[in-house]
Amino acid sequence: MARLEDLASAHYGETIWVLGSGPSLNFLTPQFFEDKTTVSTNLSAHTLGFQPDYVFSHYHRWAREMPARMEKVTLKRDTLSLEEWAGDVPDDVVLIEQDNYNPPGSAWNPLTTHPPKPHSLAYGSSSLHGSMHLAAWLGAAHIVLVGADCGTIDGEHRVEGYPDNDKLWVLYNEHHALMKEWLVREYGVTVYSLNPFVNLNLEGHKFEGV
């Protein structure tokens, strides 16, 4: 089993790209990420068709299913079952501890009521928050979110082929902004989001957000 401490500042000063699973990924190619340091949230990179450098997930099943040759970071206890990791822990899996493994829900706020546990990563309402924190932990100077859309494009709310999931866009929209604010304060990073179109008119595609 790898340790989170071993990953600290492994990519100091770099730009790190953090993938959510939103529909804007449908307008990107896997080749776009070939020369980039990437952190995938759950199955996002796998669904798009490339192998990221790191994966963060709240779910043991998805951490197990990811191929070798990349670091997988997950909670010591699975978010759904609340059970500890069963069996041997592979060398490419990092288990992080939390004081409480119950899902934090709508009240989550890293700035006030839910500061991330020291020497661990944020446990937010979305696995994306842990991915964002992992990028900062790795030493990123700049974090670029990809597919953190909090809405639909042409009626689609996920990248094509991704397992159907919840649509808590109002909640996630609020919490993503709180996570950004915390990272800027604690790490001095910049946090931006990729628009795969030429401008915010989306080349005629229709976005519906919160």
Predicted regions and their residues:
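Metal-ion/cofactor- or nucleotide/acyl-coenzyme-handling active-site neighborhoods
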Residues: 1-210
